[in-house]
């Protein structure tokens, strides 16, 4: 009786192991990458958003504000029982209109009660715009629930439902 062993050369086995390891690395990387691209929004991101939005509005920089609002953003604004919905373009035009008529302009935003859900977050917001025109001070105060979405390395306003109060002094 003869027993025959079929041994593969050790180099061939090493190549097979390496190719399987390499395939495993490629698969693991491709599964991990989307998770990294859709990073979770943090409190720091929300704080940075508020700081950036206030700075952009106070600088009257439409391009900087535009970079903080998603292209498909919708902002629903209610006042005295009437509601209107603004898209990004309408919102930016409204800001520019307020800036153009103001001899003095100020913007403040406070975000709190933030709820995080992966690459989205919702927050209560109070924004105050102070517009001085012809020595008359107008305060536009909005109380909102804002939805933020992560996009690339940025956090953007995606949706907002707002109640507006206008005070003239």
Which role fits each region the language model picked out?
Residues 1-17:
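N-terminal secretory signal peptides that target proteins for export/translocation
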Residues 92-134:
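Surface-exposed, charged secondary-structure patches
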């Amino acid at each position: 009786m003869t027993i025959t062993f079929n041994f593969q050369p050790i180099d061939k086995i090493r190549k097979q192991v390496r190719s399987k390891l390499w395939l495993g690395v490629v698969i693991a990387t491709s599964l991990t990458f989307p998770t990294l691209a859709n990073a979770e929004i943090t409190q720091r991101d929300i704080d940075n958003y508020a700081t950036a939005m206030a700075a952009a509005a106070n600088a009257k920089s439409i391009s900087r504000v535009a970079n903080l609002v998603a292209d498909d953003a919708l902002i629903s604004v209610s006042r005295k029982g009437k509601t209107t919905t603004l898209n990004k373009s309408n919102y930016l035009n409204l800001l520019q209109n307020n800036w153009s008529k103001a001899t003095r302009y100020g913007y403040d935003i406070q975000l709190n009660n933030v709820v995080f859900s992966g690459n989205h977050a919702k927050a209560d917001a109070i924004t105050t715009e102070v517009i001085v025109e012809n020595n008359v001070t107008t305060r536009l105060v909005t109380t909102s629930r804002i939805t933020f979405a992560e996009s690339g390395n940025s956090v953007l306003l995606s949706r907002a439902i707002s109640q507006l109060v206008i005070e003239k002094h």
